[in-house]
């Protein structure tokens, strides 16, 4: 099962990816992890990427696609894989096709922007333990204090409303077009066309998980 998971930041993709990978016995492939591993291993592509990153540049699609091609050829991908955070752009999706890497299904987790903002901007964290609360959905017993230690809770920079809205803006501009790209391809059909599965991500994690797994197993 070769899969792509789409959805805005905060939609719960990481949680669902773990469930999918466990159910199908496939690895979760993150471009960030892949880059770090290639740099650490000192591969030719890793050395190119390190030079660019050291200079503060963005690693090109050609290098990313080269790393993807190497990664999916490894033994643990024999039964498939799940791409996490890839492709991010139409150009990367086209590159994947050009390499002949076939995708069986694309799963889109749908969550409205305002729900994402509420989820993320309401998070509060205890720095010492990593315990996470939510001002509405999972509040601490005493406002702003950790239940166990009584120490102050903080809002992470990534969870501030302006940061969340900026990330959503980037998603809609760069990654959201992939929804049209893959859903239209699935509608047209053809031998290589992936299935396109949409799920409502506003429901409980277990409900979303069960619906995704049922849809994938029904293929």
UniProtKB/Swiss-Prot annotation:
GO terms for molecular function: adenylate kinase activity; ATP binding. It is found in: Cytoplasm. Its main location: cytoplasm. Residues 128-150 are annotated as: Disordered. GO terms for biological process: AMP salvage. Gene3D superfamilies: P-loop containing nucleotide triphosphate hydrolases. Residues 140-150 have a biased composition (Basic and acidic residues). Keywords: ATP-binding, Cytoplasm, Kinase, Nucleotide biosynthesis, Nucleotide-binding, Transferase. GO terms for cellular component: cytoplasm. Catalyzes the reversible transfer of the terminal phosphate group between ATP and AMP. Plays an important role in cellular energy homeostasis and in adenine nucleotide metabolism. NCBIfam families: adk (TIGR01351), PRK00279.1-1 (NF001379), PRK00279.1-2 (NF001380), PRK00279.1-3 (NF001381), PRK14527.1 (NF011100). This is Adenylate kinase. It comes from Halorhodospira halophila (strain DSM 244 / SL1).
């Amino acid at each position: 099962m070769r899969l792509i998971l789409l959805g805005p930041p905060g939609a719960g993709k990481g949680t669902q990816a773990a469930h999918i990978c466990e159910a199908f016995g496939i690895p979760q492939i993150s471009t960030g992890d892949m880059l770090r591993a290639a740099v650490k291993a000192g591969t030719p592509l890793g050395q190119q990427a390190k030079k660019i990153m050291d200079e503060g540049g963005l690693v090109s699609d050609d290098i990313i696609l080269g790393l993807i091609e190497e990664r999916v050829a490894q033994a643990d991908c024999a039964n498939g894989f799940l791409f996490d955070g890839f492709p991010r752009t139409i150009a990367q999706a086209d590159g994947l096709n050009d390499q002949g890497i076939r995708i069986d299904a694309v799963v889109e987790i749908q969550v409205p922007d305002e729900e994402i903002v509420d989820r993320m901007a309401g998070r509060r964290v205890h720095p010492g333990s990593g315990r996470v609360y939510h001002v509405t959905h999972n509040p601490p017993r005493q406002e702003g204090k950790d239940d166990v230690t009584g120490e102050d809770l903080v809002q992470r920079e990534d969870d501030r409303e302006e940061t969340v809205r900026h990330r959503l803006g980037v998603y809609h501009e760069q990654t959201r077009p992939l929804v049209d790209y893959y859903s239209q391809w699935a509608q047209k059909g053809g031998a290589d066309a992936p299935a396109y599965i949409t799920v409502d991500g506003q429901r409980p994690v277990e409900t979303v998980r069960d619906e995704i797994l049922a849809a994938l197993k029904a293929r």
